[in-house]
Amino acid sequence: MNPGYSSTASQPGHNPSALPHDVHHALPAIGHPGSYHASMPQLPSIPPSMPPHYSDQYGMMQQPQDQPAPSSTTEGGAETKPSADAVARTQKKLQPHVGEQDGRKYRLDVVQQPKRARMCGFGDKDRRPITPPPCIRLIVTDAVTGKEIDCNEIEHTMYVLNVDLWSEDAQQEVNLVRHTSATPSISSTTPASFAQIDSTPPAFAQIPGTNREMPSYPQSQAYAPSVTPFAQQGGYGQQAISPVGPHYGMVANTYGGQGGYTYASPTDMHPHQLGSQVGPYGPRIFNGAPDMGMHQRMALQGTHQGAPPQGMFTRNLIGSLSASAFRLNDPQEKIGIWFVLQDLSVRTEGIFRLRFSYVNVGAPTRTPNGGPANQTSILNTGKAPILASCFSDAFQVYSAKKFPGVCESTPLSKCFAGQGIKIPIRKAEGGGKNNDDDDDY
């Protein structure tokens, strides 16, 4: 017998002959160790081309850190490139948007592309920005002649650039991240978008602290009038129920003047109670915490059968997500209108892209019919169209252990820092023990 193999028959207390007759025949026959090994379920073997750090996360594979392009692995270990259709969709999505307004065309040019960053997790104490800082130049041309308009003739004080975080293939917005478990671990998160929250089924409750109204089933029925602790004190307004369609009754919480909304299931109330709450019976109402802000938002979990687990939603891209325009000189002493995004960080690791959208929040000079607008304010109080948008190159966000360090300060960053833009500039090599922390503004 193999010394590394011991059967249960040789152990005390496990002699098959001492067992009852029917139990003895019900036991599986113990044969050669090779046959026992062959009867055990075999786990899938790890492909030979898989990096070593995959061994502990097999089945939850992520994109290799040294491969910027998305790829998949076949059973034989060979890597396959994205299909032609996927590449075509990505190329189509990456096409910049050029808008036109008042006889001028607007286009964005990402002169300084982001390259890498270190993930900051869910703490903001040791947050590192994306390096080098993205620098975007706004190019304004005449719609008829196509010539670039002089920057001195452009009033840029109301120009704003917004930034979003997108996936590597530019097909999905990943501005949010959600915990997939009860513990707030950065390794158990999935990216999400605002559109996915808006399409959440009624089983999942609202996101407190926002104007997005999400329906929610109450956790249980209550045969008592619904009264909040604030209403018992008599210091706040009572709750009024107004009908919202044939299926839900909306309950407005008037605490503090903040519009938190919850929804009650129609199964917990009679049809005549949809319009108003009458009688001693009413649905149990759960009011979201009014002091929860946009930074960390909790999705309240439904309790009906089939509801997948919900967790906390928080922003994946943090920092200054918008920037004003500046008239700056580049290293070649050419003046232009620039947007500098020097304070952007990503919570999770992966490969991402940034999408930049330019809007003019100033009051329109012309009406939609083409006539002169009555400018009573310098600020646009209505809707402002996106006049130009574009994507950045793909950049990689590393974990703290794999982060190779911040990029060297570029001549463009040093040039803008000399003109008053707050860009972190690294000191000369040898000036400090840890170059990653030797950043000046």
From Swiss-Prot:
One of its GO terms (biological process) is sporulation resulting in formation of a cellular spore. Disruption phenotype: Leads to reduced formation of conidia. The keyword Glycoprotein does not apply. Residues 1-104 are annotated as: Disordered. Gene3D superfamilies: Velvet domain. The keyword Transcription applies. Keywords: Cytoplasm, Nucleus, Sporulation, Transcription, Transcription regulation. Pfam families: Velvet. InterPro entries: Velvet, Velvet_dom, Velvet_dom_sf. GO terms for cellular component: cytoplasm; nucleus. Residues 100-426 form the Velvet domain. Component of the heterotrimeric velvet complex composed of LAEA, VEA and VELB; VEA acting as a bridging protein between LAEA and VELB. Forms a heterodimeric complex with VOSA; the formation of the VELB-VOSA complex is light-dependent. Component of the velvet transcription factor complex that controls sexual/asexual developmental ratio in response to light, promoting sexual development in the darkness while stimulating asexual sporulation under illumination. The velvet complex acts as a global regulator for secondary metabolite gene expression. Component of the VELB-VOSA heterodimeric complex that plays a dual role in activating genes associated with spore maturation and repressing certain development-associated genes. This is Velvet complex subunit B. It comes from Pyricularia oryzae (strain 70-15 / ATCC MYA-4617 / FGSC 8958). The lineage of its organism: Eukaryota, Fungi, Dikarya, Ascomycota, Pezizomycotina.
